[in-house]
């Protein structure tokens, strides 16, 4: 299920650089993390949904590239975000 606009606003307000921030790496990574978590729960129930599994792999790859970009431009912001989201690195 897609994220509702209320869920997006909540995530963006807590992870964005300002209230209307949608383009910073932190905001994008936080939104992707929520979508990945939702899709992972879906796949636990629907094990044979291979189309959604491919979508999940694409989202994980996109998040990985954004995380790598953030680590290259600002290591402190990268470490802070990884800790806040609870991702392993």
From Swiss-Prot:
Organism: Mycobacterium leprae (strain TN)
Superkingdom assignment: Bacteria
Pfam families per record: Ribosomal_S15
Any one GO BP annotation for this protein: translation
Quaternary structure annotation from Swiss-Prot or TrEMBL: Part of the 30S ribosomal subunit. Forms a bridge to the 50S subunit in the 70S ribosome, contacting the 23S rRNA.
Gene: rpsO
Name of the protein this chain belongs to: Small ribosomal subunit protein uS15
Protein family per UniProt: Belongs to the universal ribosomal protein uS15 family.
Key words of the record: Ribonucleoprotein, Ribosomal protein, RNA-binding, rRNA-binding
GO annotations of cellular component type: cytosolic small ribosomal subunit
GO molecular function: rRNA binding; structural constituent of ribosome
């Amino acid at each position: 299920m897609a994220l509702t606009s209320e869920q997006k606003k909540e995530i963006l307000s807590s992870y964005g650089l300002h209230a209307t921030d949608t383009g910073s790496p932190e905001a994008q990574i936080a939104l992707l993390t929520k979508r990945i978590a939702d899709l992972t729960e879906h796949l636990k129930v629907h094990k044979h949904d291979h189309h959604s599994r491919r979508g999940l792999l694409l989202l994980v790859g996109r998040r990985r590239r954004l995380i790598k970009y953030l680590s290259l431009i600002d290591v402190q912001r990268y470490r802070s975000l990884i800790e806040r989201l609870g991702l392993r690195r």
